[in-house]
Amino acid sequence: MSQTTEARWVTEARKNLHVREIKGPQHCAEILQYWRDIKRSGIKDDETPWYTAFVGAMLERVGIQSTRFESARSYLTWGTELREPVPGCIVVFARDGGGHVGFVIGQNENRDLLVLGGNQSDAVNVRSFPRTRVTGYRWPAGEALPGDARLAVQSAQKSTSEA
């Protein structure tokens, strides 16, 4: 991957920035497809926390097998461990009641991570997260790391809900 090339799973994820849950008895077809993409077709609603389904679906769509599991923490043993974040890596966070997972795309001036993820305030979007919540960084096994591993400084709203 060259300096100017984004990880292909992040490019795929950006195509989903319009996706959000539908309140009420209807359910978002794209979110239900994320579950099918990770071989979890038994989940039939968009209220079930879907951040891991989103990450897994983006990986599967570009030919990389995900954990195919519902837990964000399942990514702590997947792929290759990284000591520091690089653009496009998977980041796993701790949160009350569980975890969260998404793709690192940058950092803000305070060095909070900017994360492209699903089920962030019920939508696919970019939000900032404090590094103090990080439990791990992972990279797909067999995939080349980016040539320029520096995180671009950008801005994003702070994450307030990932469940």
Name each region found by the language model:
Residues 25-47, 94-135:
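Glycine-rich catalytic cores of cysteine/serine-nucleophile enzymes that process amide/ester linkages
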